[in-house]
Curated annotation (Swiss-Prot):
Belongs to the class I-like SAM-binding methyltransferase superfamily. CmoB family. The keyword Transferase applies. Keywords: Transferase, tRNA processing. Homotetramer. One of its GO terms (molecular function) is transferase activity, transferring alkyl or aryl (other than methyl) groups. Carboxy-S-adenosyl-L-methionine binds at K91, W105, K110, G130, D152, P153, T154, I181, E182, M196, Y200, R315. The keyword Transferase applies. This is tRNA U34 carboxymethyltransferase. PANTHER family: PUTATIVE (AFU_ORTHOLOGUE AFUA_2G14390)-RELATED, TRANS-ACONITATE 2-METHYLTRANSFERASE-RELATED. Its EC number is 2.5.1.-. Coiled coil: none annotated. InterPro entries: CmoB (IPR010017), Mo5U34_MeTrfas-like (IPR027555), SAM-dependent_MTases_sf (IPR029063).
Amino acid sequence: MIDFGNFYSLIAKNHLSHWLETLPAQIANWQREQQHGLFKQWSNAVEFLPEIKPYRLDLLHSVTAESEEPLSAGQIKRIETLMRNLMPWRKGPFSLYGVNIDTEWRSDWKWDRVLPHLSDLTGRTILDVGCGSGYHMWRMIGAGAHLAVGIDPTQLFLCQFEAVRKLLGNDQRAHLLPLGIEQLPALKAFDTVFSMGVLYHRRSPLEHLWQLKDQLVNEGELVLETLVIDGDENTVLVPGDRYAQMRNVYFIPSALALKNWLKKCGFVDIRIVDVCVTTTEEQRRTEWMVTESLSDFLDPHDPSKTVEGYPAPKRAVLIARKP
C-alpha cells in the first residue's frame, strides 16, 4: 500500500497546510473506490524493490543513482525485473544502479529546452500538473527546488514514481498524488506551476489555464508546454476523431493564439521561449515501451503530417507570470 502520510506530515508544517482540509478525504476515497485492476500487482513491484541508499545521486544532469560497491548480477536482475513489471515507461530516462530505463520520451531533452528560461528554482515549492512518472520533478529538485508536488491520475505513473523514489533512498523532496487538477482547491501556494503535455487533452483549455493560475502565489511563474500549429493569433486546430492516433486531443492553438489565451486569463510577462518539432529520436519505441510510438502516428510518405493528414506534432514552451 502506498502511504501518503509523509506528505500530510510535511505540508502540515508549511504554507500548504490548508490543503489538509480536503486532501486526505480525497485520497481515502481514491484508495477505497478508484483503484485500477492491476494496481496491486504494480504496488507489489514497488514493495519488493530493495531498500537502497544511493552513494552517488545526480539529479542536476540526469536522474542517476549509484551504490558505493557495484550491486551483484542477481541484485541488478531483481531491480530490472521489478521495474519491467511497471512497463510501459513513457517519461525518463532513469539510470538506477546499472539498470538503464530507456523510456519512450527523452524527457531530458525537454528539460534542457525549458530550464534556461526558468526563474531560479532554488527554494521554490513547485506543482507539476500531469507529471507522469515524475521524471521532471526529480530534475526540479536537482535544480534546487525545496519541494515538488506532482499530480497525475494515472495509477501506473504513481507506482513508477514510488519505485524510483524508493531506489533514490526514499527521497521525500518530491511527491505524487493520484489526482487531476480539477480536484484541487484554489491553493494559491506554489511558486512555479508546470503544465507540460496537458493542455491539448483538456476540453476547455481556458478553464485549465484558470485552474493553473489558481494554484500560483502572486508573482508566481507558469511554465506551459503544449502542442501548437503554425499560424497567427487567431489560428486554432480542432482535430476530428483523432490526432496522431490520440482520441483525446481537443484544441491545438498557434503559439501566438496561446499567448492571447494566457493574456485573457490575466497572466502577464508572457514569453514564447521555445518552439520545436517533435522528432522520432525524442519519442520512440524502446525495450521499456514496446507498443506504437510517434513513427507509427506519422504519414509514412510525408512525416510532416500525421496519419490523419494534420500537421505533425510541434511543441511550444511559454512562460508567464501571475501578477
